[in-house]
Amino acid sequence: MLRDDVLELLNRYCTVVYYPLEDENNNGFHITDIPDKNGKLHTFVFINSAQTLEKQIFTAAHELGHIWQVDQYVEQECDLEVGEALRERIINRFAAELMIPQKVFEESYRVEYQKVEMPDKKITLGNMLVVIVNLMNQFLVPEKAIVVRCFELHKISQQTANLILGEGEVRKDIIDKKIGEIIRDNGYIKFQNPTNKKWIARYADLLDKADRSGKISKDKIKKIRTMFSINEEDIQEKLNDPLNVEGPNAS
């Protein structure tokens, strides 16, 4: 299972920008073919770190699908005309296959289901939410990704999926409250918390080089460091801290 390793995988194929936009529903997007000063083309992915970690992880998998042009592959192999709506469905399915592989998921689902099933092999809505939250923890993906995967692999009906996602007779706020309780009761502290991360890979090093070169004003560099929470003094102080380790010749 990839879990949050997908964030590092994404880093290999593009420059990832993390920044919190609290009033923005967009979880992320990508921009391709941006030239640098030498004309080399680069791809950038923005991830909204005001979203929860599990949403950031699924967003990373989604954007990886765009970078790998999975939609174009499907279009060519299946001889389809792929519009925007279908394109997003293809990429979402790719992200689900990447983050929640079928064989592993089905075994995990079986184990979790058997823990809470009734003697007649049925399950209550409350216990189904327990199964979903435990699977969220195993795969580190959002609730909706698990629910949709359950439906895709014929574990639950469309009606049950709609019910859990707040499109049935039970209000979504009641479902969300119960899910939150299960998360807290199990100590799944990573969930439902935004990271508010401000970071661009290798950006701190580039700012240091720009600072030393004198090509960018000190004020502008300071402003950028503040924007991305890069504190030069703290970084330098940490690098200069002696480590509590023994040398190779210690007896």
Regions found by a protein language model. Name each.
Residues M1-S251:
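Active-site hotspot residues in diverse enzymes, especially metal/ion-binding acidic/histidine motifs
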